[in-house]
């Protein structure tokens, strides 16, 4: 559902059919779900998560590319114990713009206990770097 919503934002408000592989033909002539203006405003907010000075997704910055999305972090609930102070559910859902159109995806980690880039376990320090590695393999270098 998150990827579907972000794909509508990233594609100018158009209702895009999701696929695991690129299939540009099936997404021609799709109806608009939200206005292009609203799509552009939402896209700017999501890009600011990556490009903004205080953005929680700044670990995703890649020179020459436009990337937007949202990080997420919550404490993991452990049966019989309650919410953990050491295990976290983290995520990044977002898009990268390419010449062929945006690529939209989501990375979700359940029970994360450490971060390779920070002392804090957050969506920006765990899921976002994985998203970045995925898109690096999908898009050419600029």
Residue ranges with predicted function:
Residues 63-97:
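Short, Gly/Ser/Thr-enriched beta-strand-loop segments that form substrate-interacting elements
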Residues 49, 73-75, 98-99, 109-114:
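Solvent-exposed loop/turn segments at secondary-structure junctions
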Residues 123-135:
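Short, charged, low-complexity patches
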Residues 14, 71-74, 125-126:
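Gly/Ser/Thr-rich beta-alpha loop segments that engage phosphate groups in nucleotides
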Residues 92-93, 101-119:
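Short, well-ordered beta-strand elements
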Residues 3, 18-19, 68, 96, ...:
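Generic beta-strand/beta-sheet core signal
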Residues 2-64, 113-124, 140-142:
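Conserved active-site-proximal loop/helix segments of enzymes involved in bacterial cell-wall
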Residues 5, 42, 70-72, 93, ...:
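Residue-level preference for non-acidic, small/hydrophobic
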């Amino acid at each position: 559902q998150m990827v579907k919503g972000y794909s509508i934002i990233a594609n100018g408000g158009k209702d895009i059919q999701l696929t695991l592989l690129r299939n540009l033909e099936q997404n021609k002539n799709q109806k608009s779900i939200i206005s292009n203006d609203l799509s552009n405003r939402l896209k700017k907010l999501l890009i600011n998560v990556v490009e903004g000075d205080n953005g929680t997704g700044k670990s995703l910055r890649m020179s020459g590319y436009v990337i937007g999305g949202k990080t997420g972090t919550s404490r993991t609930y452990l049966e019989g114990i309650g919410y953990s102070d050491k295990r976290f559910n983290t995520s990044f859902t977002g898009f990268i713009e390419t010449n062929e159109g945006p690529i939209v995806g989501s990375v979700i980690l359940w029970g994360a206990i450490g971060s390779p880039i920070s002392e804090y376990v957050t969506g920006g320090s765990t899921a976002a770097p994985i998203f970045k590695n995925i898109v690096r393999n999908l898009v050419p270098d600029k």
